[in-house]
From Swiss-Prot:
Keywords: Ribonucleoprotein, Ribosomal protein. PROSITE patterns: RIBOSOMAL_S9. Belongs to the universal ribosomal protein uS9 family. GO terms for molecular function: RNA binding; structural constituent of ribosome. It comes from Streptococcus gordonii (strain Challis / ATCC 35105 / BCRC 15272 / CH1 / DL1 / V288). It comes from the Bacteria. GO terms for biological process: translation. This is Small ribosomal subunit protein uS9. The keyword Ribonucleoprotein applies. GO terms for cellular component: cytosolic small ribosomal subunit. InterPro entries: Ribosomal_Su5_D2-typ_SF (IPR020568), Ribosomal_uS9 (IPR000754), Ribosomal_uS9_bac/plastid (IPR023035), Ribosomal_uS9_CS (IPR020574), Ribsml_uS5_D2-typ_fold_subgr (IPR014721).
């Protein structure tokens, strides 16, 4: 008989993370690499661990993640979102604390598109009165 597995999908900017939680020791594997190796920034690793801290389940689950698209920040946010959704399958009572921490809400902020006639989305070339 196999162990229980809990799955969740998280998204942030252009990143999509497919997350599996398996009861274990708290090891996080991202795209078949250790999380310290895959995400070099310590503050982003803290972001990834937020759902466990909020639900007091630190070190209880091994996390296996496939993530693609976006940069480090977007991928970390997508992983956090996926872990939070997977923890809901573990225990539906976590919903209140995860919702209060804002971890279940998909962050809808996206990069604004570049407009024609402007240098970037909002940056215009310098205005000359004369």
């Amino acid at each position: 008989m196999s162990q229980a597995q809990y799955a969740g999908t998280g998204r942030r900017k252009n990143a999509v993370a497919r997350v599996r939680l398996v009861p274990g020791t708290g090891k996080i594997t991202v795209n078949k690499k250790d999380v310290e190796e895959y995400i070099p920034h310590a503050d982003l690793r803290l972001v990834i661990n937020q759902p466990f801290a909020v639900t007091s389940t630190v070190g209880q689950y091994d996390v296996f993640v496939n993530v693609n698209g976006g940069g480090y920040g977007g991928q970390a946010g997508a992983i956090r979102h996926g872990i939070a959704r997977a923890l809901l399958q573990v225990d539906p009572d976590f919903r209140d604390s995860l919702k209060r921490a804002g971890l279940l809400t998909r962050d809808a902020r996206m990069v604004e598109r570049k407009k024609p006639g402007l240098k970037k989305a909002r940056k215009a070339s310098q205005f000359s009165k004369r």
